[in-house]
Amino acid sequence: MRLDTRFLSGFPEALSRHGPLLEEARRRLLAKRGEPGSMLGWMDLPEDTETLREVRRYREANPWVEDFVLIGIGGSALGPKALEAAFNESGVRFHYLDHVEPEPTLRLLRTLDPRKTLVNAVSKSGSTAETLAGLAVFLKWLKAHLGEDWRRHLVVTTDPKEGPLRAFAEREGLKAFAIPKEVGGRFSALSPVGLLPLAFAGADLDALLMGARKANETALAPLEESLPLKTALLLHLHRHLPVHVFMVYSERLSHLPSWFVQLHDESLGKVDRQGQRVGTTAVPALGPKDQHAQVQLFREGPLDKLLALVIPEAPLEDVEIPEVGGLEAASYLFGKTLFQLLKAEAEATYEALAEAGQRVYALFLPEVSPYAVGWLMQHLMWQTAFLGELWEVNAFDQPGVELGKVLTRKRLAG
């Protein structure tokens, strides 16, 4: 993966000038590593070979699964959904109950064969209202159709020791995977939260974690080679711009921008240590689709954005565009490939946004592979953690969501 800042003049000088600030931010972050409550366990997930073996054993023991239902919300669903959509090679059908709307829930229940369905309830705390509600609905369905065999069709992913979901799993003798204590939900994509669904999707888990290890390596590298420090500085230098657009040029990665939005917004939209409100608003975008939706605004709307484009440099396979008689208007496409068109559109949009005066940079992926995407996702986690230090906020809590939970309970109890 490489960073391109060709349209941001002066960035190399800014990197040198802000070197001490970045080094201090990294030092402060790493000084917390290993401390109880630091929530930095995501750094160690790429090295967790025991969990990888456990996930694989479970997958091998359950070859009958044709439909995989993940019940979870927020970080419990966004990471798995992004990765599974990109790398599902198994034919297993995936369904995400990351909502509490009754109509689509009932539609899903009516289409599934319970004998061939595995339900995975995911919640770090084990008390997430949406997850428990969905679990209760599916539990009733499983018991009604399968009797005492329902336990074979339910697996949970939750805290190692605590919470209602862990207690329920132990009481019922269910298989339960542990989300490490020091790993928060939005940083959990490379824990069993993501690895278990990906095992059923047939994805290359070794390559995914190898890419994440590459991100760890670059995060700890000298400043000139530390990609996460560089991109964190880009966001820091543009923190006066309220909008951060994350635009990915890959249909397979269509769910990745939503994962990034949660990672960025929930980690960094905070009251800082001086009592000031800080943060920028991440906006998801997908190329080339959003060239026909949002790019008009990006080009001629307010110059209030920092845009990051994620562009693959090569395809894993390609399709030639054939010549078609009567479509001479498309002759410039004939003989080219779909990826050549995708790459040309991405590069053209990159240049057009810069020409319009928007602040824009690109991250070029070698290809959309488990290795490259593991690198990218772990890189973005490091970027977020470094920004937490630069912006003087705790990037690993979310106090702003608690009142909504309290008021929801109050309304239901009343």
Curated annotation (Swiss-Prot):
Family matches, as CDD domains: SIS_PGI_1, SIS_PGI_2
Pathway(s) of this molecule: Carbohydrate biosynthesis; gluconeogenesis; Carbohydrate degradation; glycolysis; D-glyceraldehyde 3-phosphate and glycerone phosphate from D-glucose: step 2/4
Compartment(s) of residence: Cytoplasm
Residues of the active site: 266 (proton donor), 292, 405
Matching InterPro entries: G6P_Isomerase, Phosphoglucose_isomerase_CS, SIS_dom_sf, SIS_PGI_1, SIS_PGI_2
Gene Ontology biological process terms from the UniProt entry: gluconeogenesis; glucose 6-phosphate metabolic process; glycolytic process
Enzymatic reactions: alpha-D-glucose 6-phosphate = beta-D-fructose 6-phosphate
GO molecular function annotation: carbohydrate derivative binding; glucose-6-phosphate isomerase activity; monosaccharide binding
Enzyme Commission code: 5.3.1.9
Family: Belongs to the GPI family.
Functional summary from the UniProt entry: Catalyzes the reversible isomerization of glucose-6-phosphate to fructose-6-phosphate.
Protein name, UniProt field: Glucose-6-phosphate isomerase
Name of encoding gene: pgi
